[in-house]
Regions:
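C-terminal substrate/ligand-recognition segments
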Residues: 55, 144, 148
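Short, structured beta-strand/loop micro-motifs enriched in basic residues and often containing a Trp
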Residues: 137
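Short, well-ordered beta-strand elements
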Residues: 146-147, 153-162
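Active-site beta-strand/loop architecture of penicillin-binding DD-peptidases
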Residues: 132-134, 152
């Protein structure tokens, strides 16, 4: 995981796509958010964790596992349990409602809030999700998303390389449904 790959790893970068409504198909975009497509083989002018990290699915899974382990991975403490707890604690006041999670529509309300860098499920039943209370999640611009569910001891990482999220097929909802249907005893 880094802000650039360097030329030696350029062949490991997956292409990014966008849905072209006029053409009725997925295409390689010529620009990103009104600007030139970034060159991830070169260091960016400004390193922005919210706008330009490149990673592997395995790195993202290890990060998610570290969060599930309350800040520890492979016997090494990377974050304090208190820091991870803060990440999963809602900080949005009751009178503030937002309608996006960055790349797709989402409702922050009494059942779903936002902690330090994560959307947080406060009340799974009220949120209408199969995830457990305390689940932390987020998505990225290119159809990347993850969740960490401490109630059910589950992590999930999805990466589809599509600007605008996972698309109209709502792959995120399908992934959650199939994952939790596969659990023998979801605790919810």
């Amino acid at each position: 995981t880094a802000f650039s790959t360097g030329a030696a790893k350029a062949n490991r970068l997956a292409e990014v796509y966008v849905y072209d409504k006029a053409a009725g198909k997925i295409v390689v975009p010529k620009e990103l958010f009104g600007g030139q497509m970034p060159d991830y083989t070169k260091p960016p002018a400004m390193e922005s964790g919210g706008g330009g990290l490149v990673s592997t699915t395995m790195d993202y899974a290890r990060f998610s596992q570290m969060i599930l382990n309350k800040g520890e991975l492979d016997g090494v403490r990377l974050l304090s349990p208190a820091s991870v707890e803060l990440m999963g604690t809602n900080v949005i006041p009751k009178n503030v409602l937002l309608n996006t999670n960055g790349t797709s529509g989402s409702r922050f309300n009494e059942a779903v809030g936002f902690g330090l860098d994560f959307m947080v499920v406060k009340d799974a039943r009220a949120a209408g999700t199969l995830q457990g209370d305390g689940t932390m999640s987020w998505g990225g611009a290119a159809g990347t998303w993850f969740w960490v569910d401490p109630t059910n001891d589950v992590i999930f990482v999805g990466m589809v390389q599509r600007l605008g999220g996972t698309g109209g097929d709502d792959l995120g909802t399908q992934a959650r449904t199939l994952t939790y249907q596969a659990l023998i005893h979801p605790e919810k």
